[in-house]
Regions:
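Gram-positive cell-envelope targeting signals
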Residues: 1-41, 197
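Exposed beta-strand-loop-beta-strand "reactive/processing" segments of non-cytosolic proteins
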Residues: 56-103, 144
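Short, non-transmembrane alpha-helical segments in secretory-pathway proteins
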Residues: 28-76, 113-128
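Generic detector of intrinsically disordered, low-complexity, polar/charged segments
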Residues: 7-10, 52, 109
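Extended aliphatic helical segments
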Residues: 12, 21-24, 32-35, 46, ...
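A short, surface-exposed interaction/processing loop segment used at functional sites
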Residues: 95-140, 145-194
């Protein structure tokens, strides 16, 4: 084997190893629990400082905050994206959605009302396992033949005949009552850190 081929093989081997290391680092940087611990507190501090700006009342740093499991969004446009949506329960009500947008080796977080009022309406009416369907900027929640629609911040109950789609076999349900203890603990630690800064 010529010296040039050996050098090329060595360079390719080094590059492959570097790519594997980068992929492992990127994967480990996208651990949801770590992201919550690192960023939830600073995101929530803005809301807790000015709750009325976000359409919230009667919440502050002493409020009881719990984090539910991730929501399965069934997107009609088939644009699955790489966004993790996590409901935030404050004093027993689903008030906010904590969203994590994953990119190649990074992430962005946001927290806001989004479709939290729709989830809270379903939970309030006793529908704890629901299909969440997104059609562009409109969200639908289905459970036991009960359908609610959220467009903007307005929520209405609708009939199945008013829909342009049906539940498909590959659509997934979301659980609106299961608290994720690990996420909740990470959020509490993150809030404590943010309040001490």
């Amino acid at each position: 084997m010529s010296k040039t081929k050996k050098i090329i093989i060595a360079i390719v081997s080094i590059l492959l190893c570097a790519l594997i290391v980068i992929a492992v680092i990127c994967k480990s940087n996208q651990n949801v629990q770590k992201i919550i611990k690192d960023d939830f507190g600073s995101s929530m501090s803005v809301i807790l400082d000015n709750p009325s700006d976000f359409g919230l009342s009667d919440i502050d740093a002493s409020s009881d905050i719990e984090i539910l499991n991730e929501i399965n969004i069934n997107n009609l446009s088939n644009d699955k994206g790489n966004v993790i949506s996590i409901p935030v329960v404050i004093n027993g009500n689903i008030e906010l959605i904590y969203s994590i947008s994953l990119t190649a080796c990074s992430y962005n977080v946001s927290v806001g009302k989004d479709y939290a009022p729709l989830l809270n309406e379903m939970k309030k009416n006793g529908y704890n396992e629901v299909y969440i369907i997104q059609d562009e900027y409109t969200f639908y929640a289905f459970s036991d033949n009960h359908i609610y629609k959220q467009s903007g911040q307005e929520i209405t109950q609708i009939d199945e005949k008013d829909l342009d789609f049906t539940i498909q076999d590959d659509m997934k349900k979301s659980d609106l009552i299961s608290v994720n203890d690990d996420y909740t603990q990470a959020s509490i630690e993150s809030l404590k850190t943010a309040n001490n800064e």
